[in-house]
């Protein structure tokens, strides 16, 4: 009887595991289909503009074979080996991108700049879902931990990587849509350039207006379009290979690259600024990881995107070998006339989709940096109940829209944008290589020989590309570079202002003894209700100086007051059981403290999460002595909840040193324009109170 029962249970467990695996596979396949409409748009539509962006002069068959060989190995090494096989494994709880890798490093080594970036339980034990390699901190880790300069350089590198991804996001939509719509001018030469520009701008405006409905809804509409594109272009490529140059795949031999550079020398090096466009968009599949999953991106890339690009570029090159001067319209000229208009429609729709990958990636990295307090607060909306990494930012969306339209109207031609394109893309890839190397050494504990086998070839490849694209800066490449630098300046200005506020709070702290004196002062009243008083710091038994300012001027404090510290962590998500921590009594009657912890990918909504209920429950469970005190806490909550937050501002006077006057003045400008913290936490309007306080810089 017992044996039969054991067999039945075992079979049930196995059946359950199989069902779970089937469900996981089917979910990955569905997500893989959706990635076509979001992640790979920029990469898979690159055949529209790669050859037209090259400044070729009297190209020969050998030149085209060398160019195809370069593109094939670039796609294989950077796309397959670097991103699909290695980088996607360096995720932070499902989140990708340069900033996610930086946060991952901060979790496993003491290299972060801002405080309060670890998850603590009640016993203050560090929680990590990533394995730490014991006994292998290495000299590199110790050096970075001990050097403030190295730590700041690492932070700056991560910030630049994020900003350059956004700079890339400005050009991708513009060049994709312009290159597609430019196909009208082939059969209809009378169509003017301003008409193409206006139509392209109108299409992009429509795309940006769709973003508020969420990535899932947008990708569900866009995935069929990209599926048609990834099927149609390689089919035409195979036809072109068969008709024009069946031996094109001999160019997969790397010796054609050597011959290309031996023949063209400096000119060949300059042409790398065009061939690099074949991999633009690959960086988005890592940054968009939070919107999907690692396996879904790997499935889609290896089964669809990579074969499609290899065959499409092979077909284009085969056509151009027989029509050497058609490179300036290298895509539409290689499309057979009977299918020209169907391909024009698909290309236009695919170009619209291509814009989505960088838009989604931009939303992800902005959300990460806002939560970690490296960027001014902008509104971030979670557009999916099932996928927490799927977000939308209205301010970011409309700023991108204006910049994209400005690029179209400013450059006016896809070929001119091609000169500007690729500068920041390859820099993002180089930064990814550097951060990934640190992840291998510090977190994964990879043997130094294997790390060298990764680092040396990719560093040489990407550094060579960087040297080539730098020649394009004066021909328009300065635009995305300038946007990236401007964003980095915003982040540094914000970070500097936050650091100065932290220093001021430490110098003007309110100790628990001082709190007792303030509460025992004459004329102070305790009013009914539960008050959450937001304090940036509770470390070492002291509170924010805004508290003393509040008590001195209001002459009152709520009957039950909880000093609440929000801790935004360098981890993607915090488990619900670790949300409310460090609950304790702070001395005077009815005064408590606690910490609320969130990861940068968590959806934050105090009302929906019932934070007030969680804190009251934690107080009754861990702190409150006796039924009477517990009833007092519950009665205070029933009387009304209020959230009080100090809004400390810098007063920049004439006697302030010039450096601080510039940076803190810039910070105040940003601070005045950004959103308040309380609405971002999902706190109802009637429960919000903000107390202003000036600090002389």
Curated annotation (Swiss-Prot):
One of its GO terms (molecular function) is potassium ion transmembrane transporter activity. Glycans are attached at residues 55, 264. It is found in: Membrane. It is a multi-pass membrane protein. The keyword Membrane applies. It holds the Pfam family K_trans. The keyword Glycoprotein applies. GO terms for biological process: potassium ion transport. The chain crosses the membrane at residues 30-50, 67-87, 153-173, 190-210, 218-238, 272-292, 301-321, 339-359, 391-411, 423-443, 448-468, 476-496. Residues 1-29, 88-152, 211-217, 293-300, 360-390, 444-447, 497-697 are cytoplasmic. Keywords: Glycoprotein, Ion transport, Membrane, Potassium, Potassium transport, Transmembrane, Transmembrane helix, Transport. Residues 51-66, 174-189, 239-271, 322-338, 412-422, 469-475 are extracellular. GO terms for cellular component: membrane. NCBIfam families: kup. High-affinity potassium transporter. Belongs to the HAK/KUP transporter (TC 2.A.72.3) family. This is Probable potassium transporter 4.
């Amino acid at each position: 009887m017992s044996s039969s029962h054991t067999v039945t249970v075992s079979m049930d467990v196995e059946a359950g595991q199989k069902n779970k695996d089937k469900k996981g596979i089917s979910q990955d396949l569905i997500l893989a289909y959706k990635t076509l409409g979001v992640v790979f748009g920029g990469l898979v539509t690159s055949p529209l503009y790669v050859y037209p962006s090259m400044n070729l002069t009297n190209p020969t068959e050998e030149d085209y074979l060398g160019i195809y060989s370069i593109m094939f190995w670039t796609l294989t090494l950077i796309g397959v080996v670097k991103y699909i096989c290695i980088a996607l494994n360096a995720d932070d709880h499902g989140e990708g991108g340069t900033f996610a890798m930086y946060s991952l490093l901060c979790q496993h080594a003491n290299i972060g700049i801002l405080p309060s970036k670890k998850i603590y339980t009640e016993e203050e034990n560090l929680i990590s879902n990533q394995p730490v390699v014991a006994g292998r901190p290495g000299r590199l880790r110790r050096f970075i931990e001990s050097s403030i300069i190295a730590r700041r350089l690492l932070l700056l590198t991560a910030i630049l990587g994020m900003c350059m991804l956004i700079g890339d996001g400005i050009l991708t939509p513009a060049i994709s849509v312009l290159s597609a719509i430019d196909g009208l001018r082939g059969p209809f030469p009378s169509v003017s350039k301003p008409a193409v520009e206006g139509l392209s701008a109108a299409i992009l405006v429509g795309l940006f207006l769709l973003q508020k409905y969420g990535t899932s809804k947008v990708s569900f509409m866009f995935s069929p379009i990209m599926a048609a594109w990834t099927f149609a272009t390689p089919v035409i490529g195979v036809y072109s290979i068969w008709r024009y140059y069946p031996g094109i795949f001999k160019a997969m031999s790397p010796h054609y690259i050597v011959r290309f550079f031996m023949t063209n020398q400096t000119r060949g090096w300059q042409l790398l600024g065009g061939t690099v466009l074949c991999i633009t968009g690959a960086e988005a599949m890592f940054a968009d990881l939070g919107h999907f999953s690692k396996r879904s991106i790997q499935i889609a890339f290896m089964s669809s995107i990579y074969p499609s690009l290899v065959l499409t570029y092979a077909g284009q090159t085969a056509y151009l070998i027989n029509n050497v001067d058609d490179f300036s319209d290298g895509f539409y000229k290689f499309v057979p006339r009977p299918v020209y208009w169907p391909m024009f429609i698909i290309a236009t729709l695919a170009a619209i989709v291509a814009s989505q990958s960088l838009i989604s990636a931009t939303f992800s990295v902005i959300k990460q940096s806002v939560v970690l307090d490296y960027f001014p607060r902008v509104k971030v909306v979670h557009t999916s109940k099932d996928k927490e990494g799927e977000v939308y930012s209205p301010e970011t969306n409309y700023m991108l829209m204006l910049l994209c339209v400005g690029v179209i109207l400013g450059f006016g031609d896809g070929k001119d944008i091609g000169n500007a394109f690729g500068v920041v893309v390859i820099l993002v890839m180089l930064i990814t290589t550097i951060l990934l190397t640190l992840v291998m050494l510090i977190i994964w504990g990879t043997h130094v020989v294997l790390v060298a086998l990764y680092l040396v070839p990719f560093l040489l490849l990407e550094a060579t590309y960087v040297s080539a694209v730098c020649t394009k800066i004066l021909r328009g490449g300065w635009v995305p570079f300038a946007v990236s630098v401007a964003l980095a300046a915003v982040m540094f200005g914000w970070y500097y202002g936050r650091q100065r506020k932290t220093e001021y709070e430490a110098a003007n702290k309110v100790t628990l003894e001082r709190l007792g004196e303030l509460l025992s002062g004459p004329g102070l009243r305790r009013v009914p209700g539960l008050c959450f008083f937001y304090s940036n710091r509770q470390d070492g038994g002291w509170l924010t100086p805004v508290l003393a300012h509040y008590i001195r001027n209001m002459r009152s404090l709520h009957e039950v007051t909880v000093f609440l510290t929000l801790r935004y962590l360098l981890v993607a998500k915090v488990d619900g059981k670790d949300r409310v921590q460090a609950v304790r009594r702070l001395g005077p009657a009815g005064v408590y403290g606690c910490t609320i912890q969130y990861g940068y990918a968590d959806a934050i909504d105090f009302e929906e999460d019932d934070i007030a209920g969680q804190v009251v429950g934690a107080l009754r469970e861990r702190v409150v002595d006796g039924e009477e005190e517990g009833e007092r806490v519950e009665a205070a909550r029933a009387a009304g909840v209020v959230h009080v937050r100090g809004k400390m501002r810098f007063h920049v006077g004439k006697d302030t040193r010039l450096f601080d006057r510039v940076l803190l003045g810039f910070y105040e400008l940003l601070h005045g324009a950004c959103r308040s913290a309380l609405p971002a936490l999902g706190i109802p309007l009637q429960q919000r109170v903000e107390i202003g306080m000036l600090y002389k810089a």
